[in-house]
Amino acid sequence: MSKAQYALVGDIGGTNARFALVARDSFELEHIQVLPCNDYANLDEAVRDYLAHHPEAEVHEACMAFACPVHGDTIKMTNNHWTFNKADMQARLGFDTFKYVNDFTAMALGTLHVADERLQKVGGGEGKDGAARLVIGPGTGLGVSGLVRTMTDWAPLSTEGGHVDFAPTDEVEISVLRILKERFGRVSVERILCGEGLLNLYRSLCEIDGVEPAHTQPSQVTEAALANSDVIAHKTLKLFCAIFGRVTGNAALTLGALGGVYVCGGIIPRFIEFFRDSDFRQCFEDKGRMRDYLGGIPVYVVTETYTGLLGAAEALKNQEVH
């Protein structure tokens, strides 16, 4: 009996490696499994362990997303011990095709295949068919990418947009900038719009108000804000959403993202209702004479758990991803 033809897709983070199989000409993820990276010496051990549980699948193609730079001949994970030469790894695994993409590039490509029920709309009209899309997401850092339609496919834009300068707009934000500038020298928006950035913002607001910080983890700040049990934590989360709105609006203007904005990452989906009620949308649109332009752009919060795997499946078949 012949085996079924599948491709292997992966989303490799610092802690976990997520794997799935996709059938030819399909984007449906099958046999999703999450493996702890620390349980394996390197990628090939994890892949072999995963495939050993699916002997019915014949796999000759693979695409994987990595939470680290992927240009060059060597993959060196930022937050775990895995490191390998690309050509050697492909030979060891015996794949005819093996594509490597950055994790946020995969996230951007994955938004093309997220089901409608996993998209939470936050204002705006309808996205323009074929127009550029912005994909942005606070998580461990601030990922910024885009999707531009070509003659054949959607081309992902790899950017370092999370490292643009933080531009304060009122006295409180100016004070935050001064405090963070003393600590970091240059202050990018990522110093505020990520997990550690939320903590930076909280500590700055505590310093402005002359109180000792009560929380030491970003999750503690979020929990206290949502429970309305800490005034400064609540103020922190509100300001986080407002600053994120301005930064997202700037990025949408730069890209011309009339196709819509897709908010990914692990932070915003944890408090969608708070986010929806925050000043995010107002600050997103607050661009003077460009207000109407931004007012029509829809913003979607992506709640799909495996967007990166969907993106790896897209990248494997996408002619714009090499």
Curated annotation (Swiss-Prot):
It comes from the Bacteria. GO terms for biological process: glycolytic process. CDD domains: ASKHA_NBD_GLK. InterPro entries: ATPase_NBD (IPR043129), Bacterial_glucokinase (IPR050201), Glucokinase (IPR003836). It is found in: Cytoplasm. It catalyses: D-glucose + ATP = D-glucose 6-phosphate + ADP + H(+). ATP binds at residues 10-15. Its main location: cytoplasm. It is an enzyme of class 2 (transferase). One of its GO terms (cellular component) is cytosol. Signal peptide: none annotated. GO terms for molecular function: ATP binding; D-glucose binding; glucokinase activity. Belongs to the bacterial glucokinase family. This is Glucokinase. It comes from Hahella chejuensis (strain KCTC 2396). The gene is glk.
